[in-house]
């Protein structure tokens, strides 16, 4: 689950992390009132969407008068902001963050992720903060420093101080940087975050350490423990198909291809997409129906996939372990009839009651294309999507 920048900063402040003063706003008038309340002579008008690259996309503006605050708020609110993370369709901006301006002497980068290899939280930091951290990671990875945090000991003072020095924090600000990193780690750990990114973390003209931006992702499976974070969820920022899928305990992620995939098990689903790509196709989605798929769930899965106008064919790939192939076959047939399926359907199933499942499909009277293995299934669905 993702949240907005201003919400991430609310969390950080609870853990003692310094952020600029600011207010979320939903209208131009609110934006001007927020600037008046903040005082000062410089304000930053920031689009609030669940995507990075807002500055490059024109979603972050520095205003030096209240008239400019009004102008930029009017320009940004309601705009479709396109960044490298939104895709070409962009995101509609429905809320802003108005913040006090900052005296930036140096921009740094600090992030945390769960590192599966070390089975620890990895802290990553770089002296090259700001909008081009992706470029740094790709072209000069040696400028990114890492420490893998022991979950028992936490982030040690010595580890934080070492990282701070490596990224160029002034000696007089090392203590602040240490407190920031330890506060960020505590926030990350206690909120069940999967990613936290501060880009940029700045050193101000008077050598204060301030989190100028904040990005958080959380483990959706842990949100039952954090109702206060769950309340921050912005459904307007999420794919309607993914929201609908979650109502039926389906794990669905939209992609940009034209072959719908319905699979049981996340590993098999990823392998299925890989094989489709291997045979020259492009998956339109990741869809895991789980181990207890019912006819209703399969039907809803078909409905969700078919809302995508780009879909040219569907591949159902099932391994019958907990789930029996005959039950899936009946669900596929019922779903195909209920949604009035008009695109080619390829089904590959193996495992419990496999032969019975294939028999049910063969006797259904529906133009279902069957396959005996994944390679054959991928080849057939790619050909079907191409009209061959």
Swiss-Prot record:
> Which InterPro entries does this one have?
ATP-grasp (IPR011761), ATP-grasp_succ-CoA_synth-type (IPR013650), ATP_grasp_subdomain_1 (IPR013815), Succ-CoA_synthase_bsu_CS (IPR017866), SUCC_ACL_C (IPR005811), Succ_CoA_ligase-like_bsu (IPR005809), Succinyl-CoA_synth-like (IPR016102)
- Chain sites annotated for binding ATP: 46, 53-55, 99, 102, 107
Q: Which domain of life is it from?
A: Bacteria
| PROSITE patterns referenced in this protein's UniProt entry, alphabetically | ATP_GRASP (PS50975), SUCCINYL_COA_LIG_3 (PS01217)
Would you tell me the Gene Ontology cellular component terms? cytosol; succinate-CoA ligase complex
Names of the cofactor(s): Mg(2+)
Residue numbers binding substrate: 264, 321-323
Annotated keywords:
ATP-binding, Ligase, Magnesium, Metal-binding, Nucleotide-binding, Tricarboxylic acid cycle
Which positions are annotated as binding Mg(2+)? Answer: 199, 213
Q: Which stretches make up the ATP-grasp domain?
A: 9-244
Which pathway features in its UniProt record?
A: Carbohydrate metabolism; tricarboxylic acid cycle; succinate from succinyl-CoA (ligase route): step 1/1
What chemistry does it catalyse, as a reaction equation?
Answer: succinate + ATP + CoA = succinyl-CoA + ADP + phosphate; GTP + succinate + CoA = succinyl-CoA + GDP + phosphate
Q: What is its EC number?
A: 6.2.1.5
Cofactor binding comment, as recorded: Binds 1 Mg(2+) ion per subunit.
One Pfam family it belongs to = ATP-grasp_2
The record's Gene Ontology biological-process terms are: succinyl-CoA metabolic process; tricarboxylic acid cycle
User: Which protein family is it in?
Assistant: Belongs to the succinate/malate CoA ligase beta subunit family.
The record's listing under NCBIfam families reads: PRK00696.1, sucCoAbeta
Q: How does it assemble?
A: Heterotetramer of two alpha and two beta subunits.
| The protein's name in its UniProt record | Succinate--CoA ligase [ADP-forming] subunit beta
Organism listed in the record: Janthinobacterium sp. (strain Marseille)
Gene that this polypeptide is encoded by: sucC
